[in-house]
């Protein structure tokens, strides 16, 4: 049988054995050289070609190993990222039945609840990654920002799930799966950060009255009171509306609505827990005023867990809440008890009151904007890992339990490539009437780092005298003090002095406006592209 080398070894005339041996040696040497080129040089060239994709990864070698699973030699960065995300979707879909099986094997109701939360978060994450693939394909700056926001939310979802399971000692059952998903989410963010985007769009669009993702009709709605709005459905306890509970009205709202759907809730106290699921898009809930329409609940961590303890939760994109009070009345003795949890992208909370004690407002994930609202609490009462801006709000520390300290914020950013952070701008950070006379007995701080890359900036705001001179407090020892970013810029009031502030590597007294700009509506939440349509008042930059 002929061999591949036969043409080099066969002679039609008289064969010289020395020449034949030399030819054989040459061919073997050539074959070995080609082998080395293909199997040694080619991977090196791949690594050189695609190493930029992993340049912002915390573990670049691990990132490259993931990239090598799906890369082809002709793939550009965007194509590689898309293939990686497609595989990521499959992995999450495979994880869902694993978590569901474990849930069905557990009898403890609280543990089942934690696993139910994980299933919900995984389901949301599948959609967010799928949407990111479509956004990346458009190759524009605004869509790149969308993808970064959504993938940041995916990582937050996975970390939230792991936190929930860890609190019930369930992480060992799911830890391997979750650790893998968390790692891949971080790699996806690193790859996205390395993919260049066109410069043909400008995300900062000057001053306006809302981020760009708020339509002109939404603007008009947000300039109106509830009774003046032509609502799709009305909620009234006395039977004069379409429904007597908000939960019924939300459940009846159309799924995946592309236009604004308004539910008007008349004056009254509604004792219920409400969830605006991911399918309830572009939903607006409006009441008769923050002191007139009250939604109240009392779920808490003592009786369950933090994530589902909210009185109202919103996940559906484009959510608007206006002229309503959301409260959790569990009290300080019940520890974490959330009034409002928001994971809805491009959401607006306007002229609302949010009342509780510990963990009042869970700004969980995605882009959020709060305006002219009143938020009260004690420990970590604004927490989560959203990209969130508060403007013209009153942020009010209450009297905590004995031996407790007030923490205004506890930001939960876990990766430097996440486009998340808490920005408090043009706000009043003040003491409640019950705290004010005893504020020397209960210290109040601007925040503490919940996660390793915690990021919070307080700027152009009034800080009352209850703020401790050190300003910020550690979470545990020196955890995150080098990796966090905490900043203060142009604040005023008796608590605004920075001479006695903490000396952490990650703390910054900002003097350059350019350093403050990333925490504005324009840049942190790309507000110029979506708030315009809501009609809520806002400032996009640093100048009112």
From Swiss-Prot:
CDD domains linked to this entry: PMEI-like_4
Active site residues according to the UniProt entry: 359 (proton donor), 380 (nucleophile)
Residues at the site labelled Transition state stabilizer: 358
EC number(s) stated in the UniProt entry for this protein: 3.1.1.11
Localization in the cell: Secreted, Cell wall
Keywords, ordered alphabetically: Aspartyl esterase, Cell wall, Cell wall biogenesis/degradation, Fruit ripening, Glycoprotein, Hydrolase, Secreted, Signal, Zymogen
One Pfam assignment: Pectinesterase
Annotated PANTHER family: PECTINESTERASE
Note: The PMEI region may act as an autoinhibitory domain and prevent untimely PME activity during transport.
Record-given protein name: Pectinesterase 3
Taxonomic source organism: Solanum lycopersicum
């Amino acid at each position: 049988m002929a061999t591949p080398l036969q043409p080099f070894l066969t002679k039609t005339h008289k064969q010289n054995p020395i020449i034949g041996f030399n030819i054989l040696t040459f061919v073997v040497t050539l074959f070995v050289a080609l082998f080395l080129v293909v199997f040694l040089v080619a991977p090196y060239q791949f690594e050189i070609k695609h190493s930029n994709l992993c340049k912002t990864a915390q573990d670049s070698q691990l990132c490259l190993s993931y990239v090598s699973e799906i890369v082809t030699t002709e793939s550009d960065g965007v194509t590689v990222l898309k293939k990686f995300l497609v595989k990521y979707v499959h992995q999450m879909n495979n994880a869902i039945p694993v978590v569901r099986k474990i849930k069905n094997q557990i009898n403890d109701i609280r543990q089942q609840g934690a696993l139910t939360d994980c299933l919900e978060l995984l389901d949301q994450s599948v959609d967010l990654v799928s949407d990111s693939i479509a956004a990346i394909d458009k190759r524009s700056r605004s869509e790149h920002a969308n993808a970064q926001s959504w993938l940041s939310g995916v990582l937050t979802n996975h970390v939230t799930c792991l936190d929930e399971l860890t609190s019930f000692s369930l992480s060992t059952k799911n830890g391997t799966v979750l650790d893998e998903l968390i790692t891949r989410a971080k790699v996806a963010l690193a790859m996205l950060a390395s993919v260049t985007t066109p410069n043909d769009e400008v995300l900062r669009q000057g001053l306006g009255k809302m981020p760009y993702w708020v339509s002109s009709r939404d603007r008009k709605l947000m300039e109106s009171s509830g009774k003046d709005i032509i609502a799709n459905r009305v909620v009234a306890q006395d039977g004069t509306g379409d429904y007597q509970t908000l939960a019924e009205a939300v459940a009846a709202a159309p799924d995946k609505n592309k236009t604004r759907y308004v539910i008007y809730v008349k004056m009254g106290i509604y004792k219920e827990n409400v969830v605006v699921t991911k399918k309830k898009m572009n939903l607006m809930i409006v009441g008769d005023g923050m002191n007139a329409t009250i939604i109240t609940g009392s779920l808490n961590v003592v009786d369950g867990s933090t994530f589902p303890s909210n009185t109202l939760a919103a996940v559906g994109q484009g959510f608007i809440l206006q002229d309503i009070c959301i409260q959790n009345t569990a009290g300080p003795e019940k520890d974490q008890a959330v009034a409002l949890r928001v994971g809805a992208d491009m959401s607006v909370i306007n002229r609302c009151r949010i009342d509780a004690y510990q963990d009042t407002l869970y700004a969980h994930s995605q882009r959020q904007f709060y305006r002219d609202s009143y938020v009260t609490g004690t420990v970590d009462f604004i927490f989560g890992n959203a990209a969130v801006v508060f403007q013209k709000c009153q942020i009010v520390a209450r009297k905590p339990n004995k031996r407790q300290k007030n923490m205004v914020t506890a930001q939960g950013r876990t990766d430097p490539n996440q486009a998340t952070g808490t920005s408090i701008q043009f706000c009043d950070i003040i003491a409640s009437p019950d705290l004010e006379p005893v504020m020397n007995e209960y210290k109040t701080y601007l925040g503490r780092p919940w996660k390793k890359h915690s990021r919070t900036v307080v700027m152009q705001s009034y800080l009352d005298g209850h703020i401790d001179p050190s300003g910020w407090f550690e979470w545990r020892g020196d955890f995150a003090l080098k990796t966090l970013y905490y900043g203060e810029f142009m604040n005023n009031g008796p608590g605004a002095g920075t001479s006695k502030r903490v000396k952490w590597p990650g703390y910054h007294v900002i003097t350059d406006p350019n350093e403050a700009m990333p925490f504005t509506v324009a840049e942190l939440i790309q507000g110029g592209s979506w708030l315009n349509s809501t009609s809520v008042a806002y400032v996009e930059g640093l100048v009112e």
